[in-house]
């Protein structure tokens, strides 16, 4: 069975095991924070397979996590914000995928992660960004998230910056992220198929890795309790910076 799994996923068993552990940890983070699953997988998984191959796998992981968390997301989310972000993201993903095909993958990811570090640092410094409270800020953030999703599958990090900038309860912020990622996953699938990124191997890898990711999500949800809600925003912003910085360092070292 193990050799068959290796052949099915076109990966050695050792790499499959490492990738499964990465997905478990990423799912744990997603279950608590409501985002960062794809970012965690991209930041670590690129040591095993290329970003272009990881993007469709991340789609399956995000969809699995969304199904586990959607009920709470629908009940507690700011639906206007989540839907607006999803609309913008839908328009942005094709641009990002086109850029991915046109420029070097490492360069595209370096640009995306650099933007994340800058914006997250600004928010940790408590600098107000009035633009994010406008309709243009809403749809613009969604569009940028779509582009970054196509570039490096870290669009959820951009949306997290927008949602965390709102003066809303932690539970609502987390739920809005969950709802956006579900809606965004539905529309992103169309672009992935259109660009030929979602092939049979990607589907099988995504389905297999959904099991450890789903287990991680369940464990992470158990950690999101009221007494820790005040830690939510600083934890998420610090997580954004850490993940993005890790990706940048890896890219620079491999250059």
Give the residues covered by each predicted segment.
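Cytoplasmic-side transmembrane-helix entry/capping segments in multi-pass membrane proteins
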Residues: 78-89, 109-113, 133-143, 172-179, ...
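Small-residue-rich hydrophobic segments that form or flank transmembrane alpha-helices
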Residues: 2, 15-83, 142, 146, ...
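Membrane helix-loop-helix hairpins that form the core translocation module of multi-pass transporters
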Residues: 51-125
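Transmembrane helix exit motif
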Residues: 2-4, 66-76, 97, 111-136, ...
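Hydrophobic alpha-helical transmembrane segments in multi-pass integral membrane proteins
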Residues: 54, 105, 109, 148-155, ...
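Residues within membrane-spanning alpha-helices of integral membrane proteins
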Residues: 16, 59, 112-116, 120, ...
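Small-residue-rich segments of transmembrane alpha-helices in multi-pass membrane proteins
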Residues: 43-52, 86-97, 119, 139-151, ...
